[in-house]
Design a protein with these regions (language model features):
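Aromatic pocket-lining residues of Rossmann-like dinucleotide-binding sites
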Residues: 19
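Rossmann-like NAD(P)(H) cofactor-binding subdomain of soluble oxidoreductases
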Residues: 88-130
Length: 130
C-alpha cells in the first residue's frame, strides 16, 4: 500500500513517521511546495529506519504529484496556520484554495484515493474535499 502525506511540516512529518514506524504501508510519499523540504524530511526519516525498526520506503517531492500515483490513502496537512487577528473566514478563504488544489492533484494521479484532511479549519476543509 502507498500513502501520500501533503505538507512536510511538523504535522505532516510526524504523520509520515508514525505511518512508517507502524508499517501501515510499503511506501510513504511526502509532498511540499518548499523546494527540497519534503526531500530533506524524507531523508531524515529514512535515516531513523534501522533505529526505529521499520522498512517503509519514504520519499519526498516538491510539488510533483505524479510521484503520488497509485496512492491508496492521502493525508492533507497543508495550509497556513491561523495568525493573531485573523478571522476564521479569512483562514477558510486561504486554506480552501490550497486544499482544493491539493485534492485535484491527488485525484488526478490516484482517482480512488481515500483522503484524510488535517488542515484547519478541519470541519470546513473536510466538507470541501467531500
Amino acid at each position: 500500500m502507498k500513502v501520500t502525506v501533503v505538507g512536510a511540516g511538523a504535522v505532516g512529518a510526524s504523520c509520515a513517521e508514525y505511518i512508517a514506524m507502524k508499517n501501515f504501508c510499503s511506501e510513504v510519499v511526502l509532498v511540499d511546495i518548499k523546494e527540497g523540504f519534503a526531500e530533506g524530511k524524507a531523508m531524515d526519516l529514512m535515516q531513523t529506519a534501522s533505529l526505529n525498526g521499520f522498512d517503509t520506503k519514504i520519499t519526498g517531492t516538491t510539488g510533483d504529484y505524479s510521484k503520488t500515483s497509485g496512492s491508496h490513502v492521502a493525508v492533507i496537512t497543508s495550509g497556513i496556520p491561523r495568525k493573531p487577528g485573523m478571522t476564521r473566514e479569512e483562514l477558510i478563504g486561504i486554506n480552501a484554495g490550497i486544499v482544493k488544489d491539493v485534492t485535484a492533484n491527488l485525484v488526478k494521479h490516484s482517482p480512488e484515493v481515500i483522503i484524510i484532511v488535517v488542515s484547519n479549519p478541519m470541519d470546513t476543509m473536510a466538507y470541501l474535499v467531500h
